[in-house]
Regions:
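Hydrophobic alpha-helical transmembrane segments of membrane proteins
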Residues: 1-46, 50-184
Length: 184
């Protein structure tokens, strides 16, 4: 729980914006768990009479629904002091497809490759590609949040920005789902 009281969005601390994005990341991780389990044990998905791409796309339906509620409510709370809470609610709902795509993309990311060289770290040995593996998925969600950042800078949500957010989120969600392949 993070509370910040300001006179308007122009005075919104950057920490609040970062905390909102981290909260959205956490919510996307939670709803992406079924995709991760399906990636680890793909037998059930393969038994369905659907193409693998269709199954992966279907795995984004529940995350979109859940994240539309979570992101919409949190954006509504951020915009309470702005005088246009419905516009902020619409913006939060419009960013949900990007985070749902991020959840599915993260769920189907490849496992770490321990057969290659490792890097020594204070936490022990790590494979060289650990960074690229860990950001696969959340990268789409953070990119999808760019119009929200623009709204924070503007201090308001014009309705054209909601349309841009929805189009941008849909494009990123399609990219995320299409690049999330079933493991062989």
């Amino acid at each position: 729980m993070l509370a910040a009281r300001t006179q308007g969005l122009g005075e919104l601390p950057a920490l609040v914006a970062v905390a909102v994005v981290l909260g959205w990341w956490t919510a996307a991780t939670a709803v992406g768990e079924p995709s991760r389990r399906a990636s680890s044990a793909p037998g059930a998905d393969r038994s369905l009479p659907l193409a693998a791409e269709v199954v992966v796309g279907c795995r984004a339906v529940v995350p979109v629904a859940v994240l539309a509620v979570v992101l919409g409510v949190s954006a509504l709370l951020v915009g309470q002091g702005a005088g246009s809470p419905l516009a902020w609610l619409a913006l939060g709902v419009a960013v949900a497809p990007a985070w749902a795509g991020a959840a599915v993309r993260a769920g189907y990311r490849p496992d770490l490759d321990w057969s290659g060289p490792v890097v020594s770290s204070p936490m022990g040995a790590l494979p060289t590609g650990v960074g690229a593996t860990l950001v696969r998925g959340p990268d789409v969600g953070v990119l999808g949040t760019v119009p929200v950042g623009l709204a924070l800078l503007l201090g308001a949500v014009p309705w054209w920005l909601v349309a841009v957010q929805l189009g941008w989120s849909a494009a990123l969600a399609a990219f995320a789902v299409l690049t999330s392949g079933q493991p062989d």
